[in-house]
Amino acid sequence: MTLTQLKYAITVSEAGSMNQAAKELFISQPSLTLAIRDLEEEIGVELFRRSSRGILLTPDGEEFIGYAKQVVEQYQLIESKYVQKEKVKKKFSVSMQHYTFAVNAFVEMVKQFGMDEYEFAVHETKTYEVIEDVRTFRSEIGILYLNEFNRKVLTKLFAEYNLEFHEILRCGVYVYMWKGHPLANKKEIDMEELAEYPCLSFEQGSYNSFYFAEEVLSTYQYKRLIKANDRATMLNLMVGLNGFTLCSGIICEELNGSEYCAVKLKSNEEMSIGYLYRKGVAISLLGQKYLDEIAKYQDKAMGSYVI
């Protein structure tokens, strides 16, 4: 296996066509086809399948291309630094469910390292996309939660994708609302008291199974339910409609502001919030620093305990 073959495979996966990839690589199509066939025979894996839509990656091919991109990018870093004498920025990317504390931890980590020598990316997104981003190497780390309801299904998916989940903290469930809500001053709230107020839930797109919901008690039959795509819209709905959502109780006023509060839900439900990463791939210095920043929020989790 050569670096050239890896570059060829990556180009084919991005072009979706042997003919187009050959043009981009400035080689003949038969030569490219032979190089890909030799690579597949050497590693014993079928990387591509032909279809009416062109060349498609197989599941094994998707995983291989993810690793191939890492190898090629590392080579390019070495080449730029030691051959071309360029100063190359180190990269770090994280994907997460909609957690303000995870975003704020990212902010604090970036402040430590600065932007001159590093290139950062943060993706606050849907549950399945968090998993997919880590699987495909788009992000080094994913932040999400497990509980008794979704643990078996998601853990099985993690295993299929060669991913590992590590718990950071475990906490009870809280009702998040604005401070002007009629129930905001209560010490605890039960589900019956919330019946007349709209429950706000993050939209999960085509992966809208209960197991991918970002909120616990996803199978509960709410009388009023509103789906939203982003946190800003959800906060506006809390104020405008006295809406609420269920959360971890980790308050982060730095980003959401001081107009909101979390009240304990009368429930035995627990959330296990942690990080997802690729099995066998070491976490980078930037990744570890980010996790260190998240760990600082353990003490801010209402009623939580550290794992």
Whereabouts are the PLM-identified features?
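Short helix-boundary/capping micro-motifs
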Residues: I10-S28
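A short LG(V/I)-centered, amphipathic sequence patch enriched
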Residues: E40-L57
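Alpha-helical linker/hinge and terminal dimerization helices associated
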Residues: E42, F64-E86
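Central regulatory/effector-binding core of bacterial HTH transcription factors
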Residues: K89-K152
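Secondary-structure junction motif
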Residues: A102-E108, N147, R151, D190-M191, ...
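Hydrophobic hinge/microswitch elements
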Residues: R135-E140, Y145, Q204-C261
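Flexible hinge/capping segments at coil-to-helix
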Residues: L157-C199
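Beta-alpha-beta core module
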Residues: E160-H166, C171, A232-V281
